[in-house]
Amino acid sequence: MAKTNISPGMQQYLDIKKDYPDAFLLFRMGDFYELFYEDAVKAAQLLEIGLTSRNKNAENPIPMAGVPHHSAQQYIDVLIELGYKVAVAEQMEDPKQAVGVVKREVVQVITPGTVVDSAKPDSANNFLVAIDFDGCRYGLAYMDVSTGEFCVTDLADFTSVRSEIQNLKAKEVLLGFDLSEEEQTILVKQMNLLLSYEETVYEDKSLIDGQLTTVELTAAGKLLQYVHKTQMRELSHLQALVHYEIKDYLQMSYATKSSLDLVENARTNKKHGSLYWLLDETKTAMGMRLLRSWIDRPLVSKEAILERQEIIQVFLNAFIERTDLSNSLKGVYDIERLSSRVSFGKANPKDLLQLGHTLAQVPYIKAILESFNSAYVDKLVNDIDSLPELEYLIRTAIDPDAPATISEGSIIRNGFDERLDHYRKVMREGTGWIADIEAKERQASGINNLKIDYNKKDGYYFHVTNSNLSLVPDHFFRKATLKNSERYGTAELAKIEGQMLEAREESSSLEYDIFMCIRAQVETYINRLQKLAKILATVDVLQSLAVVAETNHYIRPQFNDNHVITIQEGRHAVVEKVMGVQEYIPNSISFDQQTSIQLITGPNMSGKSTYMRQLALTVIMAQMGSFVAADHVDLPLFDAIFTRIGAADDLISGQSTFMVEMMEANQAIKRASDNSLILFDELGRGTATYDGMALAQAIIEYIHDRVGAKTIFATHYHELTDLSTKLTSLVNVHVATLEKDGDVTFLHKIAEGPADKSYGIHVAKIAGLPKSLLKRADEVLTRLETQSRSTEIMSVPPQVESSSAVRQGQLSLFGDEEKAHEIRQALEAIDVMNMTPLQAMTTLYELKKLL
């Protein structure tokens, strides 16, 4: 930036900008926020606004761009959404009264993790995450500045940190230490996060008291310091710091949650088609956020789960009362975010009216809850604080038709303040007084067309035409002379005018002061409001789960301590909702104490993945306290779910399907316990056939012998079904098919035993591949099945680590050993599971040329 001949105003800009080099500086100048230099050039491009210059005729004009102050929020939202920070510098004094340059200061730094106001408000949480490291463990704290939620935990490794950040869907991460290059690449390049830095711990320990580890304290303290530094105000709405342990909830990685479509559909990235979409019959924004949290973090405490179940059952048994409850909750606004707006000094009259309307609903909600006559519901009722004094204050103070801004007046109700009522009376009756004076002077003077007018320069005046100047009374004094008339005033008129102007000015100022006082009073209730918000959110989620259970005919699951899984006629809740009850085919799932692994075989499109996801969703719904989609369910309590369902490359990090498979398998076998659930779908398909088969077998044996977790392993390797003769806790199941007159029908029903065929060519037929290609594939299949012998893969002793023995078991399919070797290499290189129909056809053509 060239600083030659810089004006005082621009010098002020540069002085402020140097303190915020990583943020766009919005510099208030009159009715606009201006940006200069590089900020202006970049903002003009990002916001699609005009780029001009200051001092256009100068040798080096300063680039400039601006946005109107009244619509600035929508432009700020765009910059924040793109991952930038915005510093807002306001005028701190009236420009008309300023001596020299108007005083300006940054009043707030808005970052992706600290958004409070938005032109497009979202009911979802917006978490800012802070992480610290003590050389052994990681401290992770997170906060939603818009709701005041504040939590902290400690984690063993960076993989856990990454997963927790992903689960929180954070956009900004605050660091208190130096990351390794690999870790920084993961957060910035792969996860697209904004990294910020803070080395100072917030001094006020009262906000982070409790039994915390040192690394938890530093993470929480640095997070608080950063938030106070960027928001530049006291944050009275911050809730008490909550310490949590990952082990207190059903553990699932972000990849697991994505593959199960828990909070959004993995294919569309939309809520529709997810478990969250299915279960959401909430009526409040607070309830929506809490429901998502329950889905993200199912419980592992049987007592807590049963308590939720009891309340849902009570709600189910009382349709009329539950309907009344749902209708009453519709009148509840977002108390958490309204409280934060009060704390930030941004609450307007409409916000207070929404708060008052909500509080007016609370007694009705409380009465409905009491009518259920349930000890479990009463525990919620007893904690409900209706805040009647606050509701009364808002109801009697704020005009129900008050505008959204505090500068337009008409905010305070008549009768709330005597002085304000007096000023309003003066303004209201002043017009009548003016009319009375006009009539009196017209009659006394004999000037028939005498009238009183008003303008800003002369105020109120008598308008007298030149033809009537001789009739002007002596007590009139001249205020202005025009070509064809004169303007006069009187002492009486001046007195009335003074009273009216004083009333207008005093009324506006007094009304503003009264509103500020009321808002300050509301702020003293924030802690009580937040407690009320939590209870109402809990009630909302529980009634939502009751509505969903009744609508979809869900049942109450049971839990056992025997490691037994019994699901009778279970359904994939989301698929059933999308397809319709009549079309969905239910499946029972059974694991006795002896069984730890189900090996499931069957063709693609037959329902293996749905069967696996059905079990996972049933477990998640059950452990979050929900009723489930089945005729009967009895489950053990799981501590974690690990999945590998669906093939996908991680293109951003450059990892292949097979690498992703192996990494997820590694996480499962390292972290799973005998209380975990593992779901592996076609593990090993990302590499050559025998490599994949060998790894699949080794993983199954490892889980069987060392982990003991309940596992469903879906595979196309039919040779693996022989493992049931060796592994006592493994059973075979398959997807049943009906074969008639050459046509195959997938029944989508799970049956005992292994599948006898793969029906891969039939699936290719359904996909519409050319008949000639299908015919050739059938010929090749027949030849392979005729000429090949058993691979003997199951006979490999467990101690053999190399796959060479497997390869040595392969026979030549052709007499010419050299050609056979060439063809064998070509076959091993084929990644069947990830080929498109066109690639399959091309590959078959190339293989044919080798014969």
From Swiss-Prot:
Tell me the InterPro entries matching this sequence.
Answer: DNA_mismatch_repair_MutS, DNA_mismatch_repair_MutS-lik_N, DNA_mismatch_repair_MutS/MSH, DNA_mismatch_repair_MutS_C, DNA_mismatch_repair_MutS_clamp, DNA_mismatch_repair_MutS_core, DNA_mismatch_repair_MutS_N, DNA_mismatch_repair_MutS_sf
Q: What Gene Ontology terms describe what this protein does at the molecular function level?
A: ATP binding; ATP-dependent DNA damage sensor activity; damaged DNA binding; mismatched DNA binding
**Keyword field:** ATP-binding, DNA damage, DNA repair, DNA-binding, Nucleotide-binding
Q: What Gene Ontology cellular component terms go with this record?
A: cytosol
Sequence positions that bind ATP: G602, P603, N604, M605, S606, G607, K608, S609
Tell me the Gene Ontology biological-process terms attached to this UniProt entry: mismatch repair
Pfam families registered for this protein in UniProt = MutS_I (PF01624), MutS_II (PF05188), MutS_III (PF05192), MutS_IV (PF05190), MutS_V (PF00488)
Q: Which PROSITE patterns match?
A: DNA_MISMATCH_REPAIR_2
Q: What does this protein do?
A: This protein is involved in the repair of mismatches in DNA. It is possible that it carries out the mismatch recognition step. This protein has a weak ATPase activity.
Q: Which family does it belong to?
A: Belongs to the DNA mismatch repair MutS family.
The name this protein carries in UniProt is: DNA mismatch repair protein MutS
UniProt organism field: Streptococcus pyogenes serotype M4 (strain MGAS10750)
Q: What is the lineage of its organism?
A: Bacteria, Bacillati, Bacillota, Bacilli, Lactobacillales
Annotated gene: mutS
